[in-house]
Amino acid sequence: MIKMNDITRDGNPVLRKRAEKLTFPLDPKYLKVADEMMEYLKNSQDPAIAEKYHLRAGVGLAAPQIGLSIQMASVLVPGPDNTIDLEETLVNPVIVSQSVQIAALEEGEGCLSVDKDVPGYVPRHDRITVRYQTLDGEEKTIKLRDYPAIVCQHEIDHLKGTLFYDHINKENPLDIEDNAILIG
């Protein structure tokens, strides 16, 4: 079970490396890692388990965040009324198209690997199309918008060695395009 002590923190060079592409069939150790990453997300979103193990809530976890420089990320995005908007482990994900429309989270973004609040808007594309492989190697394409799109862009950034605060305007953190959508 992944716990907060297992999360790679900002400053560790693995978070700034471009992750290695995976080949199929996946090594069984990577299948286990994928299960553990999704388990962390589920546990972190369960208030009782999160409190018991002192887990910070997360909606996404990329392999570099647990010290592995491989192109794999798990996302578990809750929807309204206890539904799930997106539950998937993305292997070798690539954003193949994106909207011109920019969006940002009204409250800003956070990250399990960044232990401090970093205020500011993180401009993202409101709609994206992502091509990736499943854990079985099947190629899939998904279209995402709003919050799920932001979550996936955040996780895919981890695979490129980019952290969310790299996108924040350094001179004016609350500066964003006039027509940007604030989600929150």
Swiss-Prot record:
Signal sequence range: none
Reactions mediated catalytically: N-terminal N-formyl-L-methionyl-[peptide] + H2O = N-terminal L-methionyl-[peptide] + formate
GO-annotated biological processes: co-translational protein modification; translation
EC number: 3.5.1.88
Active site: E155
Cofactor(s) needed: Fe(2+)
Pfam families on file: Pep_deformylase
UniProt-listed InterPro entries: Peptide_deformylase, Peptide_deformylase_sf
Binding site for Fe cation: C111, H154, H158
Enzyme class: hydrolase
Record family assignment: Belongs to the polypeptide deformylase family.
UniProt cross-references to NCBIfam families, sorted A to Z: pept_deformyl (TIGR00079)
Task of the protein: Removes the formyl group from the N-terminal Met of newly synthesized proteins. Requires at least a dipeptide for an efficient rate of reaction. N-terminal L-methionine is a prerequisite for activity but the enzyme has broad specificity at other positions.
The name this protein goes by in its record: Peptide deformylase
Lineage per the UniProt record: Bacteria, Bacillati, Bacillota, Bacilli, Lactobacillales
Primary gene name: def
